[in-house]
Amino acid sequence: EMQRSLVGSEMCIRDSFYNERRKQLLEVEPNRGHELLAELEKDFQVTIVTQNIDNLHERAGSSHIIHLHGELTKVCSSRDPNNPHYIKELKPEEFEVKIGDLAGDGSQLRPFIVWFGESVPEIETAIDWVEKADVFVIIGTSMNVYPAAGLLNYVPRNAEIYLIDPKPVDVHSSRPIHVIQKGASEGVAELREKLLTTNHA
């Protein structure tokens, strides 16, 4: 009984944490960096691979996004988290998920988030797209979180690599990397100009 009670209280804490995060998401808007990445689709085929669990890229207008660590606005089965039949997109009025809210297989709903120690199922999809890239862009990441940091190993030899970050980032790679030492918004704007003036468009 004690063990069941502890598990239940742990789920309550987790649900409460993610419920609050969902509410906060309603108060946040995409920034200019998100919008500029979406605008790149006018001239290029763009795939965004993100470690963020928010939906700001979608709201900014990007159409092809791979969420490595899951999505805050979705819930899934606690028994079979990656089964697409039980993954549900929540409307804002459904953001409050409680103990007793069940997935289609009868198990407790849980956030569609990759928790510590769980596998990252979308990494294979990300690798497939990285292997086709003509241009690979790293924005605002320390390159220390795996498996995402390992994507650099799958960039084709003839692809250009850009790093956008206002702070110095130690990237462990023998590949030449074009560094744009600016924030995301200014950096993506500069990147777009560079790409449009070369033969990528």
Locate predicted features:
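Short, structured coil segments at secondary-structure junctions
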Residues: 7-8, 60-63, 157, 173-176
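Short, flexible loop segments at the rims of nucleotide/cofactor-binding pockets, characterized by
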Residues: 23-29, 112-119, 138-141
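SIR2/sirtuin-family catalytic core signature
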Residues: 125-201
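Short, conserved clusters of charged catalytic residues that mark active-site
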Residues: 32-35, 121, 146-147
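Cys/His-rich short segments
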Residues: 56-124, 128
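Single conserved hydrophobic/aromatic residue that forms the stacking wall/gate
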Residues: 1-8, 13
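Conserved beta-strand scaffold positions in the cores of enzyme catalytic domains, especially
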Residues: 48, 65-67, 115, 161-163, ...
